[in-house]
Each structure stands twice: as structure tokens, then as C-alpha cells.
């Protein structure tokens, strides 16, 4: 459904679907480099935010709260070797919709890229947070999603393609799932 809605959104904005996969030829920096830097930036900012949260509220049990998020909990039921497939696929689809369809459709109809970034980030954070059960989950998932969306919009706007943000988001999701200690308990 998000793919169909994204395609329709791009059609309404008169942005060719294939265009969101085309790297701007005038780009002076490698999209691969930007993908890696977006991933590193997203992870670094998420870890920084988590450490600030733990400094403010040391008794906040972030790992157990995050492991109880429904999609993370269900991902942990798969063997570790294949558990990465679900977050990887979801991240790619989310990027196609939020940074690909929404961001490029908004900028395609003349909305200022920074306003488009703010709107897309609010939409993305809401999409992530409505799936959680408590405040700790909402704060941690919300803050990480905010950083990921801002970086993704920035890179998509800079490169003219959704591919670097898609790669960064997919690696980000897989990184956090693969580094989850809960697999050791299974």
C-alpha cells in the first residue's frame, strides 16, 4: 500500500518515479560516501541521545523497553541469521515512501526542501511512534527516527536520489537488530 500511495503521490506532483533513483550527475561527492556517513551519523546521534536520556534518568530501562516493541519482539523470534531480512526490507520500503515519494513530491511541487524535511520527519516519526506501548519506547524510537529522517532527507535532497538514504536506513535497522543481545537468550 505505501508503494502504491507513493507512486500516486509522485504522479500527482509530476515527478517521474524513475527520477527518485537517478543520481544527480553534477554531484561532486560519492553517494556511497553519503550513505556511509548517514549511517554513521544516525547511529552516533542515536547513541548520544540514548546516553543523554540515561544521564537524565539512569533507571530508564531502554534495552528491555525497546525489546518489547512489537515489531522488534517479532523479529527476535526468527533465527539471528535471517532476522535482518524484515528490518532491511521495511527500511527500504519506508525510504521509498517517506524520502522517495513524499520528500520528492513535496519539493517537486515547489515546497521549500527544509519545510519538506520537517513535514516528512514529522510523518516518519509518527509512523514509528504509533507502534509503541510506552513513553520510553516512544522517546527512544522517536528520537532515533527523527535523526534518521533528517539525515535521509538531507542526503536525498543533496543527491537527488533516494538510494543513499535507503542504504543508510537499511544498514541502520540491521545494525541495531544484529547487535541486539536478546538473540543470545534465544
State what each model feature region is.
Residues 75-186:
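Transmembrane helix-loop-helix hairpins at the membrane interface
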Residues 1, 37-41, 144:
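Hydrophobic H-region at the start of alpha-helical membrane spans
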Residues 2-14:
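Alpha-helical transmembrane segments of multi-pass membrane proteins
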Residues 5, 48-52, 102, 151-152:
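Hydrophobic/aromatic residues in alpha-helical transmembrane segments
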Residues 12-91, 108-109, 186:
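Juxtamembrane helix-loop-helix connectors linking adjacent transmembrane helices
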Amino acid at each position: 500500500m505505501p508503494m502504491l500511495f507513493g507512486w500516486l503521490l509522485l504522479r500527482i506532483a509530476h515527478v517521474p518515479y524513475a527520477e527518485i533513483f537517478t543520481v544527480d550527475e553534477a554531484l561532486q561527492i560519492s553517494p556511497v560516501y553519503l550513505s556511509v556517513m548517514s549511517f554513521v551519523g544516525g547511529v552516533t546521534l542515536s547513541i548520544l541521545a540514548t546516553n543523554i536520556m540515561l544521564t537524565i534518568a539512569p533507571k530508564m530501562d531502554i534495552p528491555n523497553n525497546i525489546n518489547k516493541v512489537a515489531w522488534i519482539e517479532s523479529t527476535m523470534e526468527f533465527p539471528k541469521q535471517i532476522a535482518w531480512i524484515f528490518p532491511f526490507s521495511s527500511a527500504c520500503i519506508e525510504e521509498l515512501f517517506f524520502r522517495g515519494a513524499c520528500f520528492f513530491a513535496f519539493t517537486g511541487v515547489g515546497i521549500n526542501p527544509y519545510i519538506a524535511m520537517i513535514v516528512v520527519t514529522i510523518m516518519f516519526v509518527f509512523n514509528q511512534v504509533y507502534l509503541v506501548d510506552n513513553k520510553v519506547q516512544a522517546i527512544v524510537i522517536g528520537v532515533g527516527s527523527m535523526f534518521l529522517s533528517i539525515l535521509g532527507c538531507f542526503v536525498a535532497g543533496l543527491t537527488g536520489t533516494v538510494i543513499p538514504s535507503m542504504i543508510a536506513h537499511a544498514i541502520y535497522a540491521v545494525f541495531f537488530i544484529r547487535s541486539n543481545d536478546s538473540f543470545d537468550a534465544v
